[in-house]
Regions:
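Positively charged n-region of N-terminal signal peptides that target proteins for export
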Residues: 1-5
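C-terminal motif of bacterial Sec signal peptides marking the signal peptidase cleavage site
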Residues: 12-15
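Bacterial signal peptide processing site
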Residues: 17-19
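Short glycine-/aliphatic-rich beta-strand segments at the starts of folded cytosolic domains
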Residues: 22-39
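Helix N-cap motif at beta-to-alpha junctions
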Residues: 39-40, 83-91
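Short amphipathic alpha-helix segments
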Residues: 44-65, 97
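Surface-exposed aromatic
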Residues: 69-84
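C-terminal partner/receptor-binding element of secreted or periplasmic proteins
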Residues: 91-118
Length: 118
């Protein structure tokens, strides 16, 4: 009987410990994805896949992400700036974008950027 009482008392004491809530990290800066060219135009399949992903994300997510496409060259080069705007899910979005575009030729991903400056 003492053993059971001791066990229940120990269980009660250990279950009363304060549990830490997970810390939410706010992503700092924006994400810039550059589609470059070396004389034959950009990787259109990667650009189309990326743009479709952003549009699909915005169709399902709340809050949505703002992005801006800027032409940067004569061969169709583009910079896409995806703005964090304090979105708590932005770090996960950045990881998905990195996975989506991993191994794509002539695509450069820059994290923690200021899209107002280059």
């Amino acid at each position: 009987m003492r053993l059971i009482t001791s066990f229940l008392l120990a269980l009660l004491i250990t279950s009363c410990t304060h549990k830490m809530s997970p810390t939410v990290v706010i992503y700092q800066g924006d994400l810039r994805v550059s589609f470059n060219s070396i004389g034959s135009g950009i990787n259109h399949s990667a650009f189309d896949k990326f743009k479709a992903y952003l549009d699909d994300y915005n169709a399902k997510a709340d809050p949505k992400v703002a992005y801006q496409i800027t032409s940067t060259g004569r061969e169709g080069e583009k910079d896409v700036c995806v703005q964090a705007n304090g979105n708590r899910n932005f770090a996960g979005l950045v990881q998905h974008i990195n996975d989506l575009l991993k191994g794509e030729k002539w695509v450069n991903i820059q994290e923690h950027q200021d899209c107002g400056k280059k």
